[in-house]
Amino acid sequence: MGSNSSRIGDLPKNEYLKKLSGTESISENDPFWNQLLSFSFPAPTSSSELKLLEEATISVCRSLVENNPRTGNLGALIKVFLSRTKELKLSAECQNHIFIWQTHNALFIICCLLKVFICQMSEEELQLHFTYEEKSPGNYSSDSEDLLEELLCCLMQLITDIPLLDITYEISVEAISTMVVFLSCQLFHKEVLRQSISHKYLMRGPCLPYTSKLVKTLLYNFIRQEKPPPPGAHVFPQQSDGGGLLYGLASGVATGLWTVFTLGGVGSKAAASPELSSPLANQSLLLLLVLANLTDASDAPNPYRQAIMSFKNTQDSSPFPSSIPHAFQINFNSLYTALCEQQTSDQATLLLYTLLHQNSNIRTYMLARTDMENLVLPILEILYHVEERNSHHVYMALIILLILTEDDGFNRSIHEVILKNITWYSERVLTEISLGSLLILVVIRTIQYNMTRTRDKYLHTNCLAALANMSAQFRSLHQYAAQRIISLFSLLSKKHNKVLEQATQSLRGSLSSNDVPLPDYAQDLNVIEEVIRMMLEIINSCLTNSLHHNPNLVYALLYKRDLFEQFRTHPSFQDIMQNIDLVISFFSSRLLQAGAELSVERVLEIIKQGVVALPKDRLKKFPELKFKYVEEEQPEEFFIPYVWSLVYNSAVGLYWNPQDIQLFTMDSD
């Protein structure tokens, strides 16, 4: 490091880093700091270069860990950074590139060191290294400062208060990255942490007042999707004597190591990811999700979650109840637009889920929108490409649909939105289809994919619950959607017969076998019968509540009427089959009266006429199908590993050795 450009491989031999980590105590006023902080790196573009940086940092850290208790150099470095941040706002206003660049470099070094410290030492050791004591001869005072707390407060101030300009973009990203790194102790524990330094510093004390401002800033960073300044946008003149501070291209700021603007981390998934258009937005979103999913402290709820649960629209002029802490307002229209545009990433989908599930103001606002297709279509596209998505992303997309379908207004309005030419739907050309029919098609496709591949009962349950919530409001179903409902039932029926046959053979075999354990076909049969009953309830709900709106479903039902024969007398389905049987019988007799060789158009005409003639009181009333999403007990056991896997795979310019990760299983090394 120091005044010339550096290569990562040379870091352990760098004289400035050797001095920082050595045995000599360096005063915070020493000119050394100006020399140390005047460096630029060629930007690493791969996980192997990030790994190289990590290894180089570990080498420096070993020496620092050994000597810092005597030298206090880490504390001095932090003090240098803290003193500089006090002038940062003024420097931004005065366009003081060099000052901002050096301040950024100080934070970059702190972040690299902190990352290794957190991975390799206990919280107690970590806090000792970040406790600053003034070292002077003959001074044995026990007064000390907690620099970790000061650093975190300073980072929160920096993130929330420094104006976002080309020259401050990098330091804003670095401040957010450093907070992510501070919270990363969770990565190195198998169990979810319920008491940690994160809880100690971020949920009480001087950091607490920044809660709402931080959450608001991170949300606005996500909304704005600010792109980084172009490389080489700022050029510092070199000093003619070649001594002192040689800056070369200011890409100290723009092409530095910290501007690795591709998805960081390792593993095949990350390597294949596209470049990020806004590292600041990505990093902000990841930090927001980590904060929102921290467990409650023993004596206080998570304030970041409280802020996320309670913020309101800037258009809402009603006062906040005094009981709501950390309240703030944000532009819901801008947030909605960003959420619609960013649904290609796991983390944006997880944010949408979090807001819909936890913030009733947002949920009410979204459900009142007249352009819901902008939100629903990206979610359907996630489900449509289920083969390319990880299971967590699919779950989040499904749960979002389930939450939306809890609202009757949503279930009605989606059938009124007509879409043209859905290019990503490749099974069939859909020149015109309602959003409701498309939603049904995609959910049924997800169920069929799950039946043949993953066989995940949880996935089935959520898909069927969403269809059930919608069923009473089905309107003008597209003929293809109606066909797919019945063809799914056909698939389930075949599966039922197959499992029933296997169960029968298994029972015969068990009578003649010598205590050989047999598959539990009874359980399989029970699961498939639950799903079949749910499908029958969905069909029944549509026929009972909106028969006159759905001639295509009646047509599909009549076309495959033989499918339902075996379930008429089945004890598990007799009750729910009554209405379906009645509809089939009623319309079959009408078609019979009309004669043979009927065209599709003529059959539909007879159905439409028959709907008017069918006495509604002959259809038995059933309780309305209504399913509500409820988070399972201890949701943090699912969400915390998920969020950190997203950080691991998607954080900008942050690398963790996969062998050190304890929280989740690695897909690949």
From Swiss-Prot:
Coiled coil residues, start to end: none
Family the UniProt entry places it in: Belongs to the dymeclin family.
Reported tissue expression: Expressed in most embryo-fetal and adult tissues. Abundant in primary chondrocytes, osteoblasts, cerebellum, kidney, lung, stomach, heart, pancreas and fetal brain. Very low or no expression in the spleen, thymus, esophagus, bladder and thyroid gland.
Topological relation to the membrane, as annotated: Lipid-anchor
Organism: Homo sapiens
Broad class of where this protein is predominantly found: cytoplasm
InterPro entries, per the entry: Dymeclin
Related illness: Dyggve-Melchior-Clausen syndrome: A rare autosomal recessive disorder belonging to the group of spondyloepimetaphyseal dysplasias. DMC is characterized by progressive short stature with short trunk dwarfism, microcephaly, protruding sternum, and psychomotor retardation. Radiological features include a platyspondyly with double vertebral humps, an epiphyso-metaphyseal dysplasia and lacy pelvis iliac crests.
Keyword check for Methyltransferase: no
Positions of N-myristoyl glycine lipidation: G2
Quaternary organization: Interacts with GOLM1 and PPIB.
GO cellular component terms, semicolon-separated: cytoplasm; Golgi apparatus; membrane
Record keywords, A-Z: Cytoplasm, Disease variant, Dwarfism, Golgi apparatus, Lipoprotein, Membrane, Myristate
Origin superkingdom: Eukaryota
Claim: Cytoplasm is one of the keywords in the record: yes
Protein name: Dymeclin
GO biological process per UniProt: bone development; Golgi organization
PTM description: Myristoylated in vitro; myristoylation is not essential for protein targeting to Golgi compartment.
Molecular function GO labels: enzyme binding
Pfam families: Dymeclin (PF09742)
Compartment(s): Cytoplasm; Golgi apparatus; Membrane
Reported function: Necessary for correct organization of Golgi apparatus. Involved in bone development.
